[in-house]
């Protein structure tokens, strides 16, 4: 654009500035007064050309060219000082500033913006500083929260009761503890101290062992039986092996009815159905099994109960009794006869051994030794005569 249109555009862009036109050979050239700075173009966009992004008018200032050589650094220090970055730049001499920052255009923009506007490099450097400060504050908050959590967890762990390691007893310690338990289930303080000295265990461990041992003993010993036989074999095994009577609770329930009893399988005879309803007249037949045996054992006196397992039962057959008598007759050989037979057998074995090793024994003597062996075997196998039985005590 040239001529009047260019002048009009320049006037519209900078109405506050007064320009004078000088004609040099038919061409118009604007002459700028020394008091106003030359117009600066911020950009070539539509908004910049139309003046939509026009900056507010500033006070007139002297051109940079009128300033002396050292005034550029002073002006820069005065502007950059309040922003917080002029301290570092003030220490640098005029020759130390880069050529780009020492140009009048840079200082001109600084002077034009004034103290309120911060430099763009300063803003760019200040934002990371703020971000670093925020990150550091966040990290401090996290570290403080982690410390609080760690302290709370430590306090909780201290509050919780530490789990004690399980005590492993040696065989000697268990033997001593069992001996003391057989003597007294509730040992006094003196007994516990003596056990602690013997077993080298703390007294509280001994007390806990006795508590556990008493609980185990109560579990084994039934409250209605109170016998080690009941604990070993249970109800069925104790009744079969040792003829222990049934508990009173089962007997009372059997009087009301077998099906209503606690253990009908112990009352009903083998081979009879349990689900069937029985009348009271049929109860004796049902009680002919294990219940009958338990009732007989309950009716016997105390002295007879001790001897009952040793006495032969009346239900044994005659063949079994005969076999027992024969075995008893064979076992009635006197001790002297058994001793003589064993001595003779040892002598015969010694002679055979010497004959084989030394070869000094004649074959006739070997035959005699064999005959003696056979005679001893016949004596042991033959049952004793009735006269010998009478002689023997």
From Swiss-Prot:
Identify the GO cellular component terms for this protein: nucleus
The protein's matches in Pfam families, at most eight in alphabetical order, are given as: Homeodomain, OAR
- Is the Transit peptide keyword given for this protein? no
For bias kind Basic and acidic residues, which ranges apply? 316-340, 367-381
Chain span(s) of sequence motif Octapeptide motif: 44-51
According to its UniProt entry, one GO biological process term is: regulation of DNA-templated transcription
Q: Which domain of life is it from?
A: Eukaryota
User: Where does the record place the region Disordered?
Assistant: 121-165, 304-393
Q: Where in the cell is it found?
A: Nucleus
Which residue numbers does the motif OAR cover?
341-354
Sorted keywords for this record are: Activator, Developmental protein, DNA-binding, Homeobox, Nucleus, Repressor, Sensory transduction, Transcription, Transcription regulation, Vision
Q: What is its main location?
A: nucleus
What is a single molecular function from GO for this protein? DNA-binding transcription factor activity, RNA polymerase II-specific
Q: Which residues bind DNA?
A: 162-221
Domain CVC stretches = 222-296
What SMART domains does UniProt report for this protein, alphabetically?
HOX
Q: Does the keyword Coiled coil apply?
A: no
Sequence motif Nuclear localization signal, location on chain: 147-151
Q: Which family does it belong to?
A: Belongs to the paired homeobox family.
Q: What does this protein do?
A: Acts as a transcriptional regulator. Mediates the differentiation of V2a interneurons. Plays a role in eye development and organization of the neuroretina.
Q: What is this protein called?
A: Visual system homeobox 2
Its taxonomic path starts at: Eukaryota, Metazoa, Chordata, Craniata, Vertebrata
